[in-house]
């Protein structure tokens, strides 16, 4: 009886033949993945930036009326450092070179998260307008701080540190002059406090805020 030789083992593909080859394949895969991610990021970053610029411009126009300025608000930003609030990005409205308004954002803790508030202020410290940029408050209750849901936020236009007096910058339940919402006092209280902080920021930094913008080079 003739012995039959054992069948030859199938040869492994070259990329499985050794740990080195396997490592090379993994490195190539990682490189291709990184390149694809970079290309995808480049293709989406420009539209995202453009949308962000559009949203910023639209928000600024809501708190500083268009007829008060002849400059590009979004492009006229200067940082202002403050001992209480840190460094704040301030957008400066000008007309014929004179400062006519300022806009900046502050945030404060609401019922269920931070509430971002954009303030527009005249050079004399009077509020031109206020808008809530974002929040996570309770739908149907706290979301009345949105101008799309209620006109409550419009009531701050024309107010200042002198009107009402500082002791009355509170909701009515706390002895102030501003309405709270039925079933939601914490949210309007937080917005009132944030707006008051914004007015105090202006008061502390009025000289720097209302100084003329440097000429464009």
Swiss-Prot record:
One of its GO terms (molecular function) is FMN binding. The keyword Cell membrane does not apply. GO terms for cellular component: plasma membrane; plasma membrane-derived chromatophore membrane. Its EC number is 7.-.-.-. This is Ion-translocating oxidoreductase complex subunit G. Belongs to the RnfG family. The gene is rnfG. The complex is composed of six subunits: RnfA, RnfB, RnfC, RnfD, RnfE and RnfG. It comes from Rhodobacter capsulatus (Rhodopseudomonas capsulata). Its cofactor is FMN. The chain crosses the membrane at residues 23-43. Keywords: Electron transport, Flavoprotein, FMN, Membrane, Nitrogen fixation, Phosphoprotein, Translocase, Transmembrane, Transmembrane helix, Transport.
């Amino acid at each position: 009886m003739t012995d039959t030789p054992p069948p030859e083992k199938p040869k492994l593909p070259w990329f499985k033949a050794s740990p080195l080859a396997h490592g090379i394949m993994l490195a190539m895969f990682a490189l291709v993945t990184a390149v694809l991610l970079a290309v995808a990021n480049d293709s989406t970053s420009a539209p995202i930036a453009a949308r962000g610029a559009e949203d910023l411009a639209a928000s600024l126009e809501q708190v500083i009326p268009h007829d008060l300025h002849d400059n590009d608000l979004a492009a006229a930003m200067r940082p202002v450092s403050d001992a209480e609030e840190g460094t704040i990005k301030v957008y400066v409205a000008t007309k014929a070179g004179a400062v006519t308004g300022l806009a900046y954002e502050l945030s404060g803790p609401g019922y269920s998260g931070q509430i971002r508030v954009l303030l527009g202020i005249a050079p004399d410290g009077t509020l031109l307008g206020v808008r809530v940029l974002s929040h996570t408050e309770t739908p149907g209750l706290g979301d009345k701080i949105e101008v799309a849901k209620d006109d409550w936020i419009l009531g701050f236009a024309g107010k200042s540190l002198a009107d009402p007096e500082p002791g009355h910058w509170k909701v009515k339940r706390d002895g102030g002059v501003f309405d709270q919402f039925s079933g939601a006092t914490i949210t309007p209280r937080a917005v009132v406090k944030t707006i008051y902080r914004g007015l105090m920021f202006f008061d502390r930094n009025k000289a720097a805020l209302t100084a003329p913008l440097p000429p464009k080079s």
